[in-house]
Design a protein with these regions (language model features):
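Hydrophobic alpha-helical transmembrane segments
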Residues: 1-62, 96-196
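Glycine-rich active-site/cofactor-binding loop and its immediate structural neighborhood
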Residues: 50-78, 82
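Conserved G/P- and acidic residue-centered "switch" motifs that form tight phosphate/ATP-binding loops
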Residues: 65, 86, 124
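Basic, amphipathic juxtamembrane/active-site segments
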Residues: 69-115
Length: 196
């Protein structure tokens, strides 16, 4: 939902930063790779129990994920390879983050939360897959409750606020796992109906 409504506004806000990045010689590929490295670093920190720091670093990586596309557009350097790399690193970053969460809760001796983390990451990967498949079939694959922006918000705040004794991690894992699979179902049904 936020992906569709807010992406254009966020891109406009990112324009001045993107122009500066382009002037400094930072291309979209470099920005994508730095964002991915931040996501992996954040995931490792989460696994080690530095939840707020890890979530914050993942958030910084997510901001770079917005910036790379804006830089590509402003500099006329949008390519199919860049789009592939961006999507690929986005998915790897999600897997890394949930692996960090699963490791952390496993270390706490909470097997139910480990299982829910696996369920969450599977759903999180299916959401963009269904969009890509729908678009490959010539129909609209966007929409649903938990787009990338919503998934990041729930993950970052749910993980990060746990460090401040707000007990947000367990509810966030449950909420994420349930809502992401609801989104999978939404996208599947919507695509199915368009193919009639």
């Amino acid at each position: 939902m936020l992906d569709i409504k807010a992406r254009k506004r966020v891109s406009k806000l990112a324009d001045p930063i993107a122009r500066l990045a382009a002037k400094l010689g930072l291309g979209p590929t470099a920005i994508t790779l730095v964002g991915f490295l931040l996501a992996v670093t954040g995931a490792v920190l989460i696994g080690l129990g530095y939840l707020a720091l890890g979530a914050g670093i993942i958030g910084a990586g997510a901001l770079l994920d917005i910036l790379d596309g804006v830089v590509a557009r402003l500099t006329g350097s949008e390519t199919q390879r860049g789009a592939l790399l961006d999507t690929f690193t986005d998915r790897l970053g999600e897997v890394a983050a949930w692996t960090g969460v699963a490791y952390y809760v496993g270390d706490l001796g909470k097997p139910t939360l480990v299982t829910l983390s696996l369920i969450a990451v599977c759903g999180s990967l299916l959401v963009p897959f269904l969009r890509a498949k729908a678009e490959a079939l010539g129909v609209d694959g966007k929409g649903g409750l938990m787009g990338r922006a919503e998934r990041l918000i729930v993950m970052i705040f749910g993980i990060g606020l746990e460090d401040f004794d707000l007990h947000t991690l367990e509810p966030a894992i449950w909420i994420f796992a349930i809502l992401v699979w609801f989104t999978v179902l939404q996208r599947f049904v919507r695509t199915w109906k368009q193919l009639e």
